């Protein structure tokens, strides 16, 4: 899954961006109050371990 697709998925679950950094953006999940860092490389694939970790932190998986 690409970073842009991940961000689209997070938005569909009600998550939103709360901060932008040089290499990562910070997103907030209102479902459980979690904050996760998302890499800013829009066209790159997110590594499977990173993707699973992000989805677990926001309560999607």
Show which residues each predicted segment covers.
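Basic nucleic-acid-binding interfaces
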Residues: 2-20, 28-61
